[in-house]
Amino acid sequence: IMGPCAGGAVYSPAMTDFIFMVKDTSYMFVTGPEVVKTVTNETVTSEELGGASIHTSKSSVADGGYENDLEALLQIRRLIDFLPSNNVDGVPTWPTFDDKERYDHSLDTLVPDNPNKPYDMKELIIKTVDEGDFFEIQENFAKNIICGFGRMDGSTVGIVANQPLILAGVLDSDASRKAARFVRFCNAFNIPI
């Protein structure tokens, strides 16, 4: 979404697999701030009502919010590089420059022996995917679970992982919905998880 999307037009993006928004310039709502003021006598801004910050962190309607149009387009291209052309084609394979025999000694201590001690699962993911390239989906929503795309041996994989640093990685309703939606997408496009 680049710019305002209001009224009936807002239903179309909701039916897509991924929605990206531009911070402070894109808005998505059925009814704008003026109508809200008239009906409820509450004053809200377009950003508070349906901006990128709301849809990426609270409603989970958008999968990513970016600083400007160019960054949004670059991130969309990056996502497309991970995805098959359609639900029949296999996952794309890219050449990797990682040494097949690489060994990261920091992985020996990243996960603590004490199961009650938190650690950063995102750090573990980045250290295990090809070239540390991980594309996270809904990074600012339900942070207690991580969903995104990476590559292993050049092939796209979907990654779902609890994040022990946030709420001890517990699966609450938001995290469960986020993970289920991501798993459903991966299943529809034959992306291994």
Regions found by a protein language model. Give the residues of each.
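Short capping/connector residues at structural and topological boundaries
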Residues: 33-35, 40-44, 49, 54, ...
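Short hydrophobic/aromatic-rich motifs at helix boundaries and adjacent loops
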Residues: 24-25, 96-97, 154-155
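Short acidic/polar alpha-helix capping motifs at helix-coil junctions
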Residues: 18-20, 109-112, 159
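Conserved catalytic cores of soluble enzyme domains
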Residues: 1-88, 191
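Short, exposed beta-strand "edge-strand" segments with a Pro/Gly-rich flavor and a Y/T-containing core
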Residues: 38-44, 60-67, 110-119, 164-171
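Terminal amphipathic helices with adjacent charged low-complexity linkers/tails
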Residues: 67-125
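Short acidic (Asp/Glu) and glycine-rich catalytic loops that position anionic groups and cofactors
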Residues: 32-33, 53-60, 99-107, 158-163
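Non-catalytic terminal/interface segments that mediate subunit docking, oligomerization
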Residues: 117-193
